[in-house]
Swiss-Prot record:
Gene: TBL8
A Pfam family the protein falls into: PMR5N
Lineage, uppermost ranks: Eukaryota, Viridiplantae, Streptophyta, Embryophyta, Tracheophyta
Motif (DCXHWCLPGXXDXWN motif): 398-412
Subcellular location: Membrane
Source species, domain of life: Eukaryota
Residue window of motif GDS motif: 155-157
Protein known as: Protein trichome birefringence-like 8
Extra remark beyond the main annotation: Contains 2 motifs that are conserved in esterases, but it is unlikely that this protein belongs to the catalytically active pectin esterases.
């Protein structure tokens, strides 16, 4: 065969280009070239750019179904568990995995039925994410994955609420629950700033460290104005933090103390670089404290060992007044169904998610435990007026914390699901 007689593809293409049809297309040649360059750029970006940071739902959301979008939002998780709806538990579901108020790790203030609440319907709901299912909590598996490890909760009393919930959930897999003990012999109480429960069979400790601001709170600088009683040092991470190094799971939270009642009205202002700053606003201080938290995590924690979570803001449901001005939450017995009554996402969450987004390349095991939306529905599940025994009848209702068993159990189910997605297991 004469190779010189073979057809020349390029010659044929240019020959075709001289036809009337392609002559018309020449008019729009600049459009064709532009589109070609754009497609080439997109393909190059997908191939070359670090795929860990590529989020297809942002670029090509119009090509994805709602179900796909729900899964994509979770990045490396199988699902975005933070969006869904509350559905009633089926009566045929095995209840043996659920604990009751007899769990000895519960603070008296969270035992709502024991404190006089008549309805128990608030315990009959489960969270159903959109587009997927939340894995069933497996206490035995969680304990085994955490063998010889430490699970640490750091934050305010809402964090203690979640910590107590997890203790009760994990203890369901322990036949002799009396073996579980507090390492210092202390009773579980809101008056204790540090509590550590040991599961001896697994050599596991589950700890709670009370640090409402996460950063240092202390005396103001010398010669401060008389109205300054204390300061929040936004650039100094809490002194207890040295105890958290080496933890396998850390769950941080803060937010409920970041308001004017707990700061300015109480004579508490902000301090940075050793200097008092009375002009710094609460949310500016909050943002700066998160930067301090971020620096500590990146500098002090082992990115291979420590699985770090920052829980989002837990909504409050005071109606007809604030907590100290007659606010109530004892009238509701079912989750909210009117979306118009739902509060917008707190600005705290924007700062938290942004801080975590900035950390993703340096510490891939830092996650945003987003529970705000699902919790906003649950106006029915607070202790309200069913507080700990001995509380005066005219005391403010508790519309911040949660009855247990209750909503924090769902937070821990999501925590467990996210750990599974991360292939969590202590080393």
């Amino acid at each position: 065969m004469d190779h010189h007689q073979e057809s020349n593809p390029l010659k044929e293409i240019f020959s075709l280009s001289s036809s009337p049809f392609f002559s018309t297309l020449k008019i729009k040649k600049h459009i064709f070239v532009g589109i070609s360059l754009l497609i080439t750029f997109l393909i190059f970006s997908v191939i070359v750019v670090d795929l860990a940071g590529f989020e297809p739902h942002l670029c090509f959301g119009f090509l994805l179904s709602p179900r796909t979008l729900t899964k994509e939002r979770g990045n490396d998780d199988v699902c975005d568990y933070s969006y869904g709806r509350w559905v009633r538990r089926r009566r045929d579901v095995d209840e043996t995995s659920y604990y009751g108020e007899e769990c000895r790790f519960l603070d008296p203030g969270f035992r709502c039925l024991n404190n006089g609440r008549k309805d128990s319907g608030f315990r009959q709901w489960r969270w159903q994410p959109h587009g997927c299912d939340l894995p069933r909590f497996n206490a035995s598996d969680f304990l085994e994955r955490s063998r010889n490890g430490r699970i640490v909760f750091v934050g305010d009393s809402i964090g203690r609420n979640q910590w107590e919930s997890l203790l009760c959930m994990l203890s369901q897999a322990v036949s002799n629950k009396s073996e579980i003990y507090e390492v210092n012999g202390n009773p579980i109480s809101k008056h204790k700033g540090f509590l550590s429960m040991r599961f001896p069979e697994q050599n596991l400790t589950v700890e709670y460290h009370r640090t409402p601001f996460l950063v240092v709170v202390g005396r103001p600088p010398e010669n401060s104005p008389v109205d300054v009683k204390m300061t929040v040092r936004v650039d100094e991470f809490n002194w207890q933090s040295k105890k958290w190094v080496g933890s396998d799971v850390l769950v941080f939270n803060t937010g409920h103390w970041w308001n004017e009642d707990k700061t300015f009205i109480a004579g508490c202002y902000f301090q940075e670089g050793g200097k008092l700053n009375k002009t710094m606003g609460v949310m500016e201080g909050f943002e700066k404290s998160l930067k301090t938290w971020k620096s500590w995590v990146l500098e002090r924690l082992d990115s291979e060992r420590s699985h770090v979570f920052f829980r989002s803001f837990s909504p409050v449901h005071y109606r007809n007044g604030t907590w100290n001005l007659g606010g109530l939450c004892d009238a509701d017995t079912e989750p909210e169904t009117d979306m118009k009554k739902m509060e917008p996402d707190p600005i705290h969450n924007n700062y938290i998610s942004q801080a975590i987004q900035e950390m993703r390349y340096e510490h891939s095991k830092v996650k945003f435990l987003n529970i705000t939306y699902l919790t906003e529905f649950r106006k029915d599940a607070h202790p309200s007026r069913y507080r700990e025994p001995g509380t005066p009848e005219d005391a403010p209702q508790d519309c911040s914390h949660w009855c247990l068993p209750g909503v924090p159990d769902t937070w821990n189910e999501i925590l467990y699901a996210q750990l599974l997605a991360m292939n969590y297991r202590t080393k």
